[in-house]
Design a protein with these regions (language model features):
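Short coil/turn segments at secondary-structure boundaries
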Residues: 131-136, 190-198, 218-221
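Alpha-helical scaffold segments that mediate packing/assembly in large oligomeric complexes
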Residues: 95-182, 300-305
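Solvent-exposed loop and beta-edge segments used for protein-protein assembly and interaction
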Residues: 74, 187-189, 275
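Sequence/fold signature of self-assembling virion shell proteins
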Residues: 2-52, 103-106, 146-171, 203-305
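Internal mixed-charge
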Residues: 124, 128, 199, 239
Length: 305
């Protein structure tokens, strides 16, 4: 049996999306995901200004009381392709799976599954990094950190937060948490928020708790996970060092083109075409990430300056 396989649309979705769910951001359910974006996705931004006044008969409606905007999330389209020699895989399969002949121009079908699974797993890691750190340049998405840095509405160092002016460690991690939570606006404090940190910040806080004789912020109940005050802390390996981000899940959206027919995963046995003994892999996919309300995102990137 040839190893040629083709997956398109929803079939590709089931492969790539499941792999992506193994990474922190999707595994923990930190952001909203729209898997079937064709090209663009409108993120709604609705702001109502209250016009509360003393009661009198009649109506005097305020003008411009509702401000409605839409942020357009445009998918970037990418591809990943490579060619490998089937001969490199032959020693890893048994004679039974290869067939009775000592030489067989067809490889077992599970080689295709192995290639797809391994590549999808690596693409999931790539997506995780792009969600947070993509620079928006050729071959990259525009990641959230890049967007936060350029957005004057996002609450950050110099814009609503007085930075601690140093890399975060055991000695100052509590100060960093204090600075981030104190900067939360009322509209964010009253919501269920995600309090996420980079691995180095999580390590610093864990060391602080250990030195203070506490398992976590609740003073020893290890079943609750790591907490700070009333906030549960979650570690996201894709975040750059010295990072703290606080936001509501529904405010940030990842759009994927995995469910439309333009996206695909293909593995082609080139022996069927040019007798080269090679296998060609190609996947085509789209993605973009963005948010509706920058004023409801707290981002603290603490550095030595």
């Amino acid at each position: 049996m040839a190893i040629t396989s083709n997956y398109a649309g929803f079939e590709a979705t089931n492969i790539m999306l499941q792999a992506q769910k193994e990474e922190d951001t999707l595994r923990l359910g930190l952001i909203a995901v729209v898997p079937n974006v064709g090209y663009k996705l409108n993120l709604r931004n609705l702001d109502v200004t209250l016009g509360v006044v003393d009661y009198t008969c009649g109506t005097t409606p305020a003008t411009d009381a509702v401000n409605y905007e839409e942020k357009v999330l445009t998918l970037d389209k990418f591809k990943n392709e490579f060619e490998i020699c089937k001969e490199d895989f032959r020693p890893t399969w048994s004679g039974e799976s290869m067939g009775a002949s000592a030489w067989n121009d067809q490889s077992p079908a599970d080689m295709s599954a192995a290639i797809v699974a391994s590549t999808s797993s690596k693409l999931a890691v790539w997506f995780e990094n792009q969600i947070w750190n993509g620079a928006g340049t050729t071959g990259q998405m525009s990641g959230l950190i890049t967007q936060f840095a350029a957005d004057g509405d996002v609450i950050k160092a110099g814009n609503g937060i007085t930075a601690i002016g140093a890399a975060i460690d055991k000695s100052n991690v509590s100060d960093a948490f204090d600075a981030a939570t104190a900067a939360m606006p009322y509209s964010l404090r009253r919501k269920a928020v995600n309090f996420i940190v980079s691995p180095d910040v999580a390590d610093a806080y864990s060391k602080l708790l250990i030195s203070n004789g506490a398992a976590n912020g609740l003073g020893g109940d290890a079943n609750t996970g790591m907490v700070y005050g009333r906030y549960t802390i979650q570690t996201v390996n894709g975040l750059p060092d010295n990072s703290i981000v606080i936001f509501e899940k529904e405010n940030i959206t990842l759009g994927l083109g995995l469910a439309n027919d333009a996206d695909s995963i293909r593995v082609k046995d080139m022996d069927e075409v040019d007798f080269s003994g090679n296998v060609l892999y190609k996947s085509v996919f789209g993605g973009a990430v963005g948010y509706s309300y920058g004023s409801e995102i707290v981002w603290l990137l603490s550095t030595t300056v």
